[in-house]
Design a protein with these regions (language model features):
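Negatively charged
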Residues: 1-122
Length: 122
């Protein structure tokens, strides 16, 4: 199985430039997944299977080129309890995520810190 991506601001983080498809993987965590992937964009029209995920902490932290599409708004985030620093430093991120279910979230500490152009209703 391949349940987790974990760059955590290291490794080949600069080589990942696009996510074009999430596939049918049953993910278990996105904690620090694309942290530091400053060349990353997201064009996938499918959605990641997040039913086994409780943390998106630092998922896109420092992803300074992060642009996405409308599919991100349809992610099922009902099992997520930690959204801390998800978009911290994602300076060009400005995607609508108003449909995200945050009912289970217990912390959103610094979720949008330094996401300087983010201006969406949430």
């Amino acid at each position: 199985s391949f349940p987790q991506i974990y760059f955590n601001n290291g490794g080949d983080k600069l080589k990942i430039t696009n996510i074009s498809q999430w596939g049918s993987i049953a993910w278990t965590s996105f904690d620090s997944a694309f942290y530091g992937a400053s060349n990353l964009t997201l064009t996938a029209v499918d959605t990641p299977t997040l039913t086994g995920v409780t943390s998106l902490r630092r998922m896109f932290q420092g992803a300074t080129s992060l642009t996405t599409n409308a599919a991100m708004n349809t992610w099922d985030t009902s099992t997520i309890s930690n959204m801390s620093e998800v978009f911290l430093g994602a300076t060009v991120f400005n995607q609508n995520i108003g449909a995200w279910d945050t009912g289970a979230v217990t912390t959103m500490l610094s979720m949008f810190q330094s996401a300087t152009i983010f201006n969406q209703n949430i």
